[in-house]
Amino acid sequence: MEQNLLTKKKLKEKSIEYQISFANLLEGFLQETLMFQILETDFAKRLWLKNREAFDLDSYRKEWQKPLHFVYGQDDGKEQQVLDEKWITGFAEEICAKREYHIRWNYSVEKEEQDYLVYITGEWEEMKVPLTIRISPLVYHAAKPEKQKLQSVFFEKKCAVYQHFPVETYLAEQLFSILKFLELIPSMEVYDTTFRLLEQETVDGRHIYETLSFLCGNEEVIPQEKRIEMLESYDTYTYMKKRWEKYVRKQGIENVSWETVLHRIVLFLRPVWNAMCRDEVFFGDWMPDLERYL
């Protein structure tokens, strides 16, 4: 499929080929296009994509696309600019001025605590699709972005490089939420995300230790062993198990047992957390295939 030949008819054919609903694939097409347009601007130098899965067929099969979530990070050691409405408006105006594939874009901006939300509507072939971009300030300033390749699902020859929020920092944030909120966790998605990262990624345990220590200090959460013990006890906690099962059904994802999910998270977290509680240093690389540190 050449870049200048994408039509509504061809998108419908791809919908049948990929076994993805037309509405979902249309949303994926516009979100991917929006991402490429962002990467063509100078604003992209300060934006680190936080989503772990956003531009692949499995993501497009889901009922709704998650917002593109960026962290407003450093630009190669340059002085950090303030993340404010002026910056956000300039960003939104530039990406929405583009008319690639004859898509028309409109936007509005909203502030939500420290974050900015850019609500964008893309109109293509007389069809309108709402999309959302969330931009958050960088909290842990020692974090460094990772380079990732974005390969278009729709155009074989189209690709670009973008900055990805570092996996260890992202994972540490998930673990901090688990330990901070315990049974009051707002969404079980945090457990899902953490479990899948530990299943797929080799992780630098020292980085997790440093980031988790920073987050605890930043929000005045004292590392105590009773927190990890309480978390481990949730394997027989009916309330948490039912919440997990409800989440799995709603998301339509692989039905991994609650006990399996919690076991892997505790296995990873306990050595790091215990070292923090004892004010000891921690070294070790997590090996997902072995489910242990080396």
Question: Each PLM stretch: what is its role?
Answer:
Residues 1-47, 55-68, 72-294:
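Structured mid-to-C-terminal alpha-helical surface segments
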